[in-house]
UniProtKB/Swiss-Prot annotation:
The non-selective cation channel is gated following an off-response property by acid: gated open after the removal of acid stimulus, but not during acid application. Regulation of non-selective cation channel activity by external Ca(2+) is bimodal, first sensitizing and subsequently inactivating the current. One of its GO terms (cellular component) is membrane. It catalyses: Ca(2+)(in) = Ca(2+)(out); Na(+)(in) = Na(+)(out); K(+)(in) = K(+)(out); Mg(2+)(in) = Mg(2+)(out). Highly expressed in placenta, weakly in heart and lung. This is Polycystin-1-like protein 3. Heterotetramer with PKD2L1, composed of 3 subunit of PKD2L1 and 1 subunit of PKD1L3. GO terms for biological process: calcium ion transmembrane transport; cellular response to acidic pH; detection of chemical stimulus involved in sensory perception of sour taste; detection of mechanical stimulus; monoatomic cation transmembrane transport; monoatomic cation transport; sensory perception of sour taste.
Length: 1732
């Protein structure tokens, strides 16, 4: 509950500064505070008068250091008078001073403050002012006395004693201190030395509390300052001061430039921003107590500057702090008013240059808004201070205006949040006068006639007018009324007394403007029927209704008003004809203001009918579009007694519009208004008529019509695809099933999404369980195509007996058809008898040229832990989600088993597209003022506004996307689980099994061996010969025994090696052992029977049977009973999870919900299309084009960004949740229910036919493991090579695009033009006197054009500045940076030769100027570095022995706005480029992790790492450059008169420019990686590798010889020839000499003998000998390598051949001999080599 009191504070300061500015003296201030302890008793008033006589005041003991200073000199128990603060008036006192009080000051205080010491504690209390105590005076420096320093603690204090005293003190009239009169001098008698003691204390630049938190500030300000208050650099808000009869341009004053370092402000800012509220309050309190001791008027300017910078750097002020600050300035104003003005003629209307910056108002306002909440105890002091500041504000304004000789005068002050006008009027000029205040708070005031002001002007012929316009609400916390627009305050005063103006005969006009950006929500209606009706619901009788009609063309119409009925030409309550005549502003022509007296029917619904005139109807051929706005407004004034806004005595005038409110009031105070747009009822019929204007802008309607046609065509296609998918949703009963078999197995086969994953081969499956195995079954369906890419095929397989718990599954195919390769994802087998299922994760190829090149594979089931692991869930679900939940993509990739149809998906996409369009067009409607495309832009260029609108649309559309995308899947009907009849197990006994023949037993043995070899592929490599092709039973049994033993041993070792796997695999291992046990038992029985019946082989059969018996006993040891097994995780799962009692959605309810979803989609689509068409009709052609581009961008973002992000996020979330809660997988449960429902409908007793002789049932033969086919390896290498080439080309292209997109072809010409402009005659500068003419005739005109300023001639005598210094560079050259700074010349802080706005100050970063009023020390930049001293105070004299070395360097950088036209594509290329860099960084990091230190020995690794590091450095420099640019431009916008240094930005840009060439060079060198695949070009790398040792040796010899000759030339000729003056220049010259480009004439002329010898020997040794040997060694290595080069079949040739075939270019075929040679050699060739 605190208003912005700080705003009043600064309004108050500004006028005070204007008044006191003429007396502001630049005299230096003292730097010591002295305290005089007077040990004679006086009353408070006498003590105060005595201190004033001594040029001081009663001391303010507020600093702990001061207390420590005087503590030892205070007698215990004695009382000392000290100074006190001026407290604000209370509410019970009169808030307006009488005339005598206004002149003489506030009333005298009744209680005064004294100081006393109790032990070591010093305390202050109040007592009657008439009592007589000791007192303490304080001043800067006393008039006379000796001074010496004495150490007291950590501070140095100054003692001062009077040498002699007088009985009386004579005070001159002009030195008399302010006061009501002379006080008795009873206290002024001769004072002994012991009765008066003076203590002096050095003044710090900050109060003690501040210094504790800003220790760095004190150290930063190294220059001595004579000001007692801290000086901080300027702020950045301009202040404008305008007088009557003077233009604003002539009177605008810039903030005063300060020469202090910028670090001073930055340290203080950091300290105050980090300071707590208590510290800030204490600082404000200390300042308030310090200000009360000021007497001179120049102190006011100093206090204002300190407060200005304190408030600018303080983030917030509390209420007590603002009370103290306002109280201090009230005191200063009273002191100002007590002193009569001097030099009246000098004041005039000229604003002094030292005026305090008025932009502090904005800082205090922000601080007030950010202040924290406090208790209500501060409210009353703040309210009183507001009243007092307003009164003193008027008094100061009146005092200022009285100094002007003209009878009428005015001055205007403007800040960021307030505008103030002070004017003096008389009896003849005040009536009917008007005043207008401009930005930021526009207010217009008009006074009534002389008759209404007669009584006032008779009493006061001269009146001072004070008008204030505020852009904020100062009473926001006192009254929560919604005030909109400017707030005006009008005060009249005369003779320093406020005049009460109320109950006038005529109203005073106050016009209050509102912000033009205020949203008014206009409604566009059509006048096609020459009539429209507006319905408004009035809810308040105090407000006035404003009806604004804005036609697109001039119309003559009549408005009729009716209450609760629609008026017409004959039946109405009120009417008005528009446009109006004789209006003040044009927007009043079509505005109707209805006051409360016009709305006499009270609250209710009013109808306004607009009817075109008859002549207008005849002339109106096409329907006209009008924009209608209805709003209510009311005028208020601030009732100061009740602290609230009131409307009594004020009414809304007829000149009110949507942008302003005219208030007519009969009194003067604060005025404000509110504004509210009234909701209005829109007639839909009138809105639909807008479509008659579709010919003006058919973009939106045409786009909607095109989308509708496209939707209809696509829906027809989607409907046909959905019907075709219905045929694929079925359970196929295998044709080779036995009709009498009773055990059913449901097999779900998932084909992967890999490229060419579908197969045309015949697939066979075999199931293996603990109780046996099934027959091989051919998986086929004559009615549909099976095993399509990403498809699901469901088969029903039947067996005679139960297979028990499944442990293996075998798949193979015959490799037939056009595309036999098959990628199988997973297989799920369900046992319908026991309601269990097993998951077999395959994820492999069954092909002869892909994967492991196998056609026959055996898979084992996975456990629960592996099935629900996060890795498996995410990898499997990500593909499913992208193909099924990716809304746009799933229209084409929708799974037939998914119930979310293509038609539904397409409808959802169309709804999202229409929502996208309406959101886009709403943005363009809101931003219609800024949504114009640049005419110079290319037709397909993308603007920033279009990109931002598309991003905003995508963000808003994201939740809508989530809802619409899940609308139909959430209401899918759940299938009911069918009831299957129980199956009677009919297991055949062993006795009933028919005996097998020997051939069948051998086949059984072979099948078992093949199964074991396929199940454990690592056993296949151990078999040296294929014994499974033999018919010898002994060998087969031996092989079977070894395979089983190996399996058991391998399983045991695996369990010991990986203990965590023991809980998963042994359960499957148990079932596998049971299966082997049954197989061995059956084979042993058959072999035993054959041994008894077959006489010629009985021994073999019996031996085999006994061997199988031993193997069976071995298996029994691995098979534990069920009750003895440890608890292990099983690999079988229930077909369906246990139901939780949740009732499924019935079909009827599901159909109803589906209808509701369709209605919702239809309504959303129609509404979006309707409003899109309406909004698009109001867009211009340029806006429609931008809107179309935004729609395209939004759709692309939705397709390529929003949908993928949604899919990845939800896949990650579901995978994470399902890995912990597997029951959440409801989609698979629903699909399983649907499969079971289909299974219940199909008959499994279909007569089947099985041809046992069909070769498809024979598994492919097992061959020894061989290497992958060469064709497969070559394809892989070719694919990798193609990817490397494309990525490398893309990388280089993006790098070139990102670099050259920011370049401008005209930059060279601009650079040359600037260089020629500034370099003219610059080389002729040899002495300091030459510099000033060049700066005057070339530098300044080039910088500022033709403006020459008041002082057109620039000479050394005009400026008191030192010579330029370069402290960073020890060289003696001076550098002039044209783009980086501006030259400034100063004389005691004032500019010369240029206006101050063009010469902001000393800001050159590389130059230092010594500017001082004192005798200066000059350090000229000559080679001797002499130090010269000038003692001349008024002139400039120096001695210069050396001369300048002139050097000019020009640096420039491109602004961000210059490349904004095509910046979108540049940004896209940069983003993709840095993504590739991140990818390369990841690859290099992986290689570094693998290779460790060997990574740095690879040349390609170093090259790639260098590119990555330089790219990231460039990214950092770009970010730094953008940050600096935005920072500099923000500073420029804040204060355009302030100097902005671009030095740092230029340096960063220069570093980036020099560095950007290296990645281009390295990326070009990296193209060698592409050339090395050609055998002809690879010979170069091999040559360098072979000759590397010799090359290094020769390079070392050349370097040694070059160093020796460079040193010799430098020592012999360095003093005489400039080319050899340093070692490096000598080395460069020697290299040029060897290349033949150096001039040796100077060497021959200086020393013919020695010079000739050195040059001749260097040429012979280095050129003719060493370099020739170096080249010869390389040529020899090249010859050897060329002879050993063989013709190789490189991949690059294959790639070129494929590319030629793709483009239709004939490729020459090789002969048979060349092909044979190539094939013979190609197998031993390594294609991938390291880059040399």
């Amino acid at each position: 509950m605190f208003f912005k009191g700080g705003s009043w504070l600064w309004l108050y300061i500004r006028t005070s500064i204007i008044l006191g500015s003429e007396l502001n003296s630049p005299a230096p201030h003292g730097q010591n505070n002295c305290y005089q302890l007077n040990r004679f008793q006086c009353s408070f008033e006498e003590a105060q008068h005595y201190c004033h006589v001594q040029r001081g005041f009663l001391a303010h003991i507020w600093n702990k250091e001061v207390q420590d200073l005087i503590r030892d000199y205070l007698e215990e128990g004695k009382k000392w008078w000290i100074g006190q603060n001026v407290m604000p008036l209370k509410k019970h006192q009169d808030n307006k001073y009488p005339a005598d009080v206004a002149a003489n000051g506030p009333p005298k205080p009744l209680s005064c403050t004294y100081l006393s010491r109790n032990f070591i504690r010093i305390s202050s209390k109040g007592d009657k002012c008439l009592l007589k105590y000791y007192f303490i005076c304080q001043t800067g420096d006393f008039l006379d006395g000796d001074a010496h320093y004495e150490r007291n603690g950590n501070n140095s204090h100054l003692y001062q004693r009077h040498k002699k005293t007088k009985r009386g003190v004579a005070i001159a009239r002009d030195k008399m201190p302010p006061g009501p009169g002379h006080l008795p001098t009873t206290c002024h008698y001769p004072l002994p030395a012991h009765l008066s003691k003076t203590l002096c204390h050095p003044i710090s630049q900050f109060p003690s509390v501040l210094s504790s938190i800003t220790s760095q500030v004190t150290s930063a300000a190294s220059e001595p300052s004579s000001q007692p208050l801290p000086v901080i650099t300027q702020l950045t808000m301009p202040v404008s001061v305008t007088h009557a009869g003077q233009s604003l341009a002539e009177t605008t004053s810039s903030p005063k430039e300060e020469g202090h370092p910028n670090t001073f402000t930055s340290y203080l800012q950091v300290s105050l921003q980090k300071a707590s509220g208590q510290v800030i309050d204490e600082i404000a309190g200390n300042f308030s107590r310090a200000v009360h001791g000021l007497q001179a008027l120049n102190k006011l300017q100093e206090a204002c500057e300190f407060l200005q910078k304190l408030t600018a750097l303080t983030p917030r002020f509390s209420k007590p702090a603002q009370v103290n600050l306002i109280n201090s300035l009230i005191y200063l104003s009273e002191e100002l008013l007590r002193i009569p003005f001097q030099n009246n003629n000098s004041l005039g209307f000229k604003v002094p240059p030292t005026v305090c910056p008025f932009h502090s108002l904005n800082n205090v306002t922000k601080a007030g808004e950010g202040s924290w909440l406090e208790s209500k105890r501060h409210t009353e002091p703040v309210e009183d201070i507001l009243e007092m500041s307003l009164v003193e504000f008027g008094n100061i304004g009146e005092a200022f205006l009285e100094q002007n000789q003209s009878p009428e005068s005015s001055v205007t002050l403007t800040s960021a949040n307030a505008t103030l006008l002070l004017s003096r009027q008389n009896i003849s000029t005040l009536p009917l006068s008007s005043y207008t205040l401009g930005h930021p708070a526009p207010v217009r005031l008009g006074f009534p006639s002389a008759l209404a002001l007669k009584e006032l002007l008779n009493k006061h012929p001269g009146v001072n007018v004070q008008i204030t316009g505020l852009a904020f609400n100062p009473f926001k916390d006192l009254d929560n009324r919604n005030i909109v627009g400017s707030i005006g305050s009008v005060l009249l005063s005369a003779n320093r007394k406020l005049l009460q103006v109320h109950d006038l005969m005529e109203d005073i006009e106050i016009m209050l403007w509102r912000n033009v950006s205020l949203e008014t929500h206009p409604t566009s209606l059509n006048m096609s029927t020459h009539q429209l009706t507006i319905t408004v619901n009035v809810t308040s009788l105090e407000k006035s209704l404003i009806v604004s009609i804005d036609p697109d063309s001039p119309l003559l119409m009549t408005l009729y008003l009716g209450f609760q009925y629609q008026p017409n030409c004959t039946h109405f309550h009120l009417n008005i004809t528009l446009p109006k005549d004789k209006v003040w502003q044009k927007d009043e022509e079509y505005t109707w203001v209805l006051n409360p007296e016009h709305l006499q029917h009270g609250i209710g619904t009013y109808y306004i009918t607009a009817v075109l005139s008859e002549r207008q109807e005849g002339a109106q051929q096409t329907p006209s579009l009008v924009s209608v706005i209805t709003a209510v407004t009311q005028c208020y004034y601030w009732e100061i007694h009740n602290q609230t806004w009131s409307s009594a005595g004020c009414q809304v005038g007829p000149q009110s519009t949507i942008l302003r409110t005219q208030c007519l009031c009969n009194h003067l105070t604060f005025f404000a208004s509110d504004f509210f747009v009234v909701p209005r009822t829109v007639n839909v019929e009138d809105t639909i008529k807008l479509f008659l204007r579709v010919t003006n802008n058919p973009v939106g309607v045409s786009l909607l019509a095109s989308l509708l046609g496209f939707y209809v065509i696509t829906v027809v296609w989607a409907r046909k695809k959905d019907q075709a998918d219905m045929q694929k949703v079925k359970v196929t009963v295998l044709a080779d099933n036995d009709p009498s078999a009773q055990f059913h197995y449901l097999i779900q086969v998932y084909t992967g999404y890999r490229r060419s994953a579908a197969t045309t081969a015949k697939v066979v499956i075999t199931l293996y369980g603990s109780e046996g195995r099934s027959e091989p079954h051919h998986l086929c369906d004559p009615q549909k195509t099976v095993f399509e890419r990403g498809g699901l095929d469901v088969f029903l397989l039947t067996t005679w007996t139960s297979l028990g718990n499944l442990h293996s599954l075998r798949l193979w195919h015959d490799n037939s058809g056009v595309s036999p390769s098959w990628y199988v994802s997973q297989v799920i087998v369900c046992d319908m008898a026991v309601k269990r299922k097993w998951h077999f994760l395959c994820n492999c190829w069954l092909a002869v040229d892909l994967g492991d090149c196998e056609l026959d594979r055996v898979f084992i089931p996975v456990s629960k832990r592996e099935l629900f692991s996060f890795r498996h869930l995410f990898s499997s679900m990500i593909v499913e989600k992208f193909t099924q939940d990716y809304l746009w993509l799933s229209i084409a990739t929708r799974h037939p088993w998914n119930q979310f149809t293509r038609v539904q998906r397409l409808s959802c996409c169309m709804t999202l597209l229409l929502c996208n369009m309406v959101i886009n067009v709403m943005f363009w409607k809101i931003n219609s003022t800024t949504a114009k495309r640049d005419e110079q832009m290319r037709p397909f260029a993308v603007a920033w506004s279009e990109l931002l609108v598309s991003i905003h649309t995508a963000v808003i559309l994201f939740p809508i996307n989530l809802v619409i995308g899940r609308l139909f899947p959430l209401i899918e009907p759940q299938e009911t689980l069918p009831l299957f009849p129980p199956i009677q197990a009919s297991c055949l006994s062993d006795a009933s099994v028919e005996p097998l023949s020997a051939t069948m037993v051998v086949e059984e043995l072979k099948e078992t061996v093949r199964f074991l070899l396929r199940r454990n592929t690592y056993l296949l490599s151990k078999c040296e010969q294929p014994p499974w092709s033999s018919w010898d039973i002994t060998k087969l049994v031996k092989l079977l025994s070894s395979l089983v033993s190996s399996h058991l041993e391998g399983q045991g070792c695996h369990q010991q090696g990986e203990r965590h796997w023991a809980r998963v695999v042994p359960e499957n291992h148990h079932h596998f052992c049971c299966y082997l046990h049954r197989v061995l038992q059956r084979l042993k029985s058959h072999l035993g029977t054959l041994g008894l019946t077959q006489g010629h082989q009985s021994c073999d059969f019996l031996d085999a049977a006994s061997q199988l018996q031993k193997l069976q006993e071995l298996l029994e040891t691995h098979i534990l009973p069920t009750e003895q097994e440890p608890s292990r995780e099983v690999t079988s799962f229930a077909i369906l999870s246990s139901e939780e009692g949740k009732k499924p959605i019935s079909n009827g309810l599901s159909k109803w919900l589906t209808s509701v979803c369709w209605l919702l989609l239809g309504f959303t689509s129609l509404a979006s299309a309707f409003f899109t068409a309406l909004y698009s009709l109001e867009l211009s052609k340029d806006q429609a084009t931008s809107w179309m581009i935004s729609i395209i961008l939004s759709v692309l973002q939705n397709i390529f960004i929003s949908q993928p992000v949604k899919v990845v996020f939800f896949t990650f979330l579901y995978s994470l949740m399902m890995s912990r809660m597997p029951r959440l997988n409801k989609e698979n449960e629903q699909q399983t229910k649907r499969i079971l429902a289909l299974l219940a409908k199909c008959s499994s007793s279909v007569p089947g036919s099985r041809d046992k002789n069909n070769p498809v049932y024979v598994a492919p033969a097992i061959n020894s493991p061989t290497k992958h086919p060469e064709r497969t390896l070559k394809k892989k290498k070719l694919f990798k090579l193609t990817g490397d080439i494309l990525v490398q080309i893309l990388f280089l292209t993006l790098l070139m695009t990102a670099i050259y997109s920011a370049k401008n072809s005209n930059r060279f010409y601009l650079h040359q033009a600037i260089w020629k402009t500034f370099s003219h005659q610059f080389s002729e500068i040899k002495l300091l006197q030459d510099f000033y003419p060049w700066a005057n005739h070339i530098l300044l005109p080039s910088l500022y054009g033709d403006y020459r300023g008041k002082n057109a001639v620039l000479e050394p005598s005009h400026c008191k500045c030192g010579v330029q210094l370069i402290f960073q560079i020890p060289r003696t050259k001076t550098y002039e940076k044209v783009d980086e700074g501006q030259l400034a010349f100063c004389d005691n802080g004032h500019t010369c030769g240029r206006p101050k706005s063009l010469f902001p100050g000393l800001h050159l970063r590389r130059f230092s100027y010594i500017c001082s009023p004192r005798p200066m020390v000059l350090i000229p930049t000559d080679e001797l570095h002499e130090r010269l001293t000038s003692k001349n105070e008024n002139g400039f004299s120096y001695i210069m022995r050396g001369a300048f070395f002139t050097s000019l360097r020009l640096e420039s950088f491109t602004s961000l706005q210059m490349s904004k036209k095509g910046c979108v594509w540049s940004i896209i290329s940069q983003v993709i480029y840095y993504l590739l860099v991140c990818y390369y960084a990841f690859i290099q990091g992986c290689q570094l992790k693998q290779q460790k230190w060997r990574f740095f020995t690879g040349k390609r690794n170093i090259l790639d790492t260098s590119i990555i590091l330089i790219s990231f450095i460039l990214l950092g420099l770009d970010m730094k450059s953008i940050s600096l640019h935005k920072k500099n431009m923000a500073r420029y916008r804040d204060d355009q008169d302030r100097f902005i240094s671009f030095y740092e930005a230029v340096k960063v840009n220069s570093a980036a420019t020099h560095l950007v060439g290296f990645p281009v060079l390295l990326a070009t060198v990296q193209l060698w990686n592409l050339l090395r695949h050609s055998p002809r070009l690879r010979v170069i790398s091999r040559t360098l590798s072979r000759a590397w040792d010799e090359v290094v040796g020769f390079l070392l010899i050349i370097l040694i010889l070059l160093t020796g000759y460079a040193i010799a030339f430098n020592l012999l000729f360095g003093c005489s020839i400039s080319d050899y003056r340093t070692f490096f220049s000598s080395a460069v010259t020697v290299v040029g000499l060897l290349m033949g480009i150096s001039h040796q004439e100077e060497v021959f002329a200086l020393d013919p003998v020695l010079g000739t010898f050195l040059i001749l020997t260097s040429v012979i040794l280095m050129v003719l000998v060493v370099i020739n040997l170096f080249v010869s060694a390389i040529l020899m290595a090249f010859g050897k390598e060329r002879k050993s080069l063989k013709k190789e079949a490189a991949l690059i040739d294959t790639l070129l051949q494929k590319l030629s075939n793709l483009l239709g270019i004939s490729w020459p075929q090789k002969t048979s001999s060349e092909q044979a040679a190539t094939t013979a050699v190609g197998s031993d060739t390594e294609v991938l080599d390291e880059l040399p």
